[in-house]
């Protein structure tokens, strides 16, 4: 079933390559899957990075199953590079192992604009189809034990903050970190070299975080502006609007073939792309 489709100069409620099971069902989670995966070449020449296999299934499917297990069955996936492969594999209503059926929407940035809109641009593009409070996570992260806690979401929803992010101890490829964390559980925009942690990409946001007065992009990003997320987060931290938690479980940014191989070394065959 096709959602209202939109051309690149119209609002998402008008008409484009938006696809989903229902216009009225808002997604409670967004999986970021639009990146090119430059450092993953040649593996990503024919396969979107979130679709590379980790321990026998597509990398992004680990998150989808965890979201569904936590009761988040309505998800939105943004795509650009080789995006049709993702929708072709999952469809609109896939039956995932152990967690059952989920409902998917797609924002095909590549088809609408010819390029990915970066994180903030992609979220604003999808905003009309996202719930008032929603999860966001990158499809190329492997964190099999992360819990999309209903309690965390409810506490955040009742808080004055506009975003809650999860930080992780700095991995070898990002030794300087990204953001600080106060004893009161607030994310801090600190100058380096402060004691910083790495942004995991896991986060909860309220729609107000992406208000057009803050982002400079109208609802639905009809012009296809590409915009990064970090400047918005830093500005919101300076306003005291971003809380944070430290996650110490297994977490890997699967950004290179070497890291993918390390995850799959117990069964190297699992690192092959999906046929």
Model-predicted regions and their roles:
Residues 29-30, 54, 87-104:
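Short acidic, glycine/proline-enriched helix-loop-strand junctions
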Residues 80, 107-109, 166, 190, ...:
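Conserved beta-strand termini and adjacent loop/short-helix elements that scaffold enzyme active sites
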């Amino acid at each position: 079933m096709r959602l209202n489709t939109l051309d690149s100069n119209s609002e998402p409620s008008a008409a484009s390559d938006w696809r989903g099971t229902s216009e009225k069902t808002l997604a409670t989670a967004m999986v970021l899957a639009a990146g090119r995966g430059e450092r993953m070449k040649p593996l990503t020449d024919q396969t979107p990075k979130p679709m590379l296999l980790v321990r026998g299934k597509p990398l992004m499917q680990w998150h989808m199953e965890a979201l569904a297990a936590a009761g988040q069955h309505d998800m939105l996936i943004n795509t650009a590079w080789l995006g049709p492969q993702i929708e072709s594999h999952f469809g609109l209503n896939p039956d995932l192992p152990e967690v059952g059926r989920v409902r998917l929407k797609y924002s095909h940035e590549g088809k609408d604009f010819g390029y990915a809109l970066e994180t903030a641009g992609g979220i604003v593009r999808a905003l009309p189809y996202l719930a008032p409070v929603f999860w966001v996570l990158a499809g190329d992260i492997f964190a099999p034990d992360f819990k999309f806690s209903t309690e965390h979401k409810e506490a955040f929803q009742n808080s004055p903050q506009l975003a809650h992010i999860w930080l992780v101890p700095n991995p070898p490829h990002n030794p300087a970190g990204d953001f600080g964390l106060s004893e009161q559980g607030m994310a801090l925009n600190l100058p380096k070299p402060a004691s910083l942690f790495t942004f995991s990409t896991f986060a909860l946001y309220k729609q107000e975080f992406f208000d057009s007065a803050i982002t400079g992009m109208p609802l639905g990003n009809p012009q296809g502006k590409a915009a990064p997320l970090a400047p918005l987060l830093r500005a919101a931290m300076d306003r005291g609007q971003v809380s944070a938690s430290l996650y110490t479980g297994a977490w890997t940014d699967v950004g290179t073939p070497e890291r993918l191989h390390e995850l799959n070394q117990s069964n190297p065959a699992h690192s092959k792309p999906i046929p």
